[in-house]
């Protein structure tokens, strides 16, 4: 079976990437390696690495995350080991490990993860906080919350409170945060490389609809942010409407400012300043976009906003 | 779960849990840097101190912190996998040690034969151990362990 790329998708990404488009298409049609993160709340790297190598696994360090590794085995093998059962590692896509790095959670802080399920970034944040402070891990899909709860438990996190609330209404509880992870639902076009089915669902109409909904969610989330607080906006979408256009909205309508992001050992590009005739605020360039062919990961967009 | 259903433990109640763990597993668990809470069905949770300082009363809470285990009759506690991992490091009693074959069966949810028992009391809850890992809890009956790990955590191992 081969991935069938939609003509509208091809047209759009040829416009964004120019000659580089062929590289994107080549990677989308291939398979990228699986990745996982060692759970240092339960075990040290020194203890777990020899055990995994004994299984014949060839591990490659993910250069931007100290306890992240690539591995070339199918997911079904990764989830059927005693170490997985014990919560010694967490399967997570390599690019998805970046938003928590930008959020920089510190021990003792109180953080809101507004779209937390299934818990990859939540557990990463809990770990970075060394099991102290609080992560309010919220979601609105009960089925996904079940997975979130299982993952948080397996991870051994003591600092998570899992809540069930429509993100549009969270501000009504009156809680305010210094840091919010806003990893919003999106069209998922950055995940086509791992889930080809998404290409079938890809349409401009869906992207526009998502973009509109994301703005509503963003405006609500900002109400939960303290003055000077940080909101990290991220999507696994490559679409400017779901990314730069929403950041432009955050700057011009919600009054947030965009902070410069630096991630060592990661190839990325600046946010676009113009797309299909729409011009975005200059500060949008401080956001980062990652294409699948940049680092052999899913595509991602990340922006650090300050209130 | 409504936040109102979460009952944070007093110092006295926390001491009781420490004593139950000490009595059953001869383990001194240091709970000084965490708080404990109880929800329905006698479930006990371990939380970071900061959770207790936050007003979560209006939130629709699904879970708080780490599920340690469930209190049972006669001052006993059935520990979760994570509860066993926390307690296991200090435990000196009620430990059932498995060989590789039985450990693989255990994580798939089966009852298992014990290779070596460390002060295991008949019909008591025990910590199940393989090499350095604590795999969960079970009931020690006739040199066997009845598997008490929740179904959602069981695995099918690869060949």
Task: Give, region by region, the residue ranges found by the protein language model.
Chain A
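S-adenosylmethionine
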Residues: 1-307
């Amino acid at each position: 079976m081969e991935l069938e790329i939609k003509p509208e998708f091809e047209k759009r990404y040829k416009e964004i990437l120019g000659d580089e488009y062929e590289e994107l298409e080549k990677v989308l049609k291939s398979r990228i390696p699986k990745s996982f993160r060692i759970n240092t709340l339960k075990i040290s790297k020194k203890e777990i690495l020899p055990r995994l190598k004994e299984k014949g696994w060839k591990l490659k360090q993910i250069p931007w995350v100290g306890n992240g590794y690539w591995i070339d085995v199918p997911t079904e093998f990764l989830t059927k080991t005693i170490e997985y059962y014990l919560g010694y590692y967490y399967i997570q896509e390599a690019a998805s490990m970046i938003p928590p790095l930008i959020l920089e959670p510190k021990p003792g802080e109180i953080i809101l993860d507004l779209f937390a399920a299934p818990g990859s970034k939540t557990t990463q944040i809990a770990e970075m906080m060394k099991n102290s402070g609080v992560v309010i891990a919220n979601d609105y899909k009960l089925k996904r919350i079940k997975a979130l709860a299982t993952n948080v438990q397996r991870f051994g996190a003591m600092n998570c409170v899992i809540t069930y609330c429509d993100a549009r209404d969270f501000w009504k509880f009156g809680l305010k945060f210094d840091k919010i992870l806003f990893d919003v639902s999106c069209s998922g076009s950055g995940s086509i490389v791992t889930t080809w089915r998404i290409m079938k669902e890809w349409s401009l109409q869906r992207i526009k609809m998502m973009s509109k909904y994301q703005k509503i969610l963003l405006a609500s989330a900002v109400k939960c942010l303290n003055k000077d607080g940080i909101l990290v906006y991220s999507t696994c979408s490559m679409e400017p409407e779901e990314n730069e256009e929403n950041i432009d909205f955050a700057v011009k309508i919600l009054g947030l400012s965009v902070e410069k992001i630096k991630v060592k050992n990661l190839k990325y590009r600046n946010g676009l300043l113009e797309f299909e005739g729409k011009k975005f605020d200059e500060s949008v360039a401080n956001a980062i976009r990652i294409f699948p062919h940049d680092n052999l990961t899913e595509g991602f967009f990340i922006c650090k906003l300050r209130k | 779960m409504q936040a109102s259903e979460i009952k944070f433990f007093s110092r006295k109640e926390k001491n009781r849990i420490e004593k139950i763990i000490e009595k059953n597993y001869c383990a001194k668990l240091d709970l000084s840097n965490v708080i404990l809470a109880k929800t329905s069905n006698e479930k006990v949770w371990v939380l970071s101190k900061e959770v207790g300082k936050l007003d979560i009363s209006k939130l629709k809470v699904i879970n708080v912190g780490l599920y340690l285990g469930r209190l049972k009759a006669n001052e006993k506690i059935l520990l979760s996998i994570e509860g066993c991992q926390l307690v296991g490091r200090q435990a000196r009693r009620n430990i059932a040690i498995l060989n590789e074959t039985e450990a693989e069966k255990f994580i798939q949810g089966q009852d298992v034969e014990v290779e070596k028992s460390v002060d295991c009391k008949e019909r008591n809850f025990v910590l199940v151990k393989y090499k350095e890992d604590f795999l969960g809890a079970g009931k020690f009956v006739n040199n066997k362990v009845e598997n008490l790990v929740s179904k959602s955590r069981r695995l099918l191992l690869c060949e």
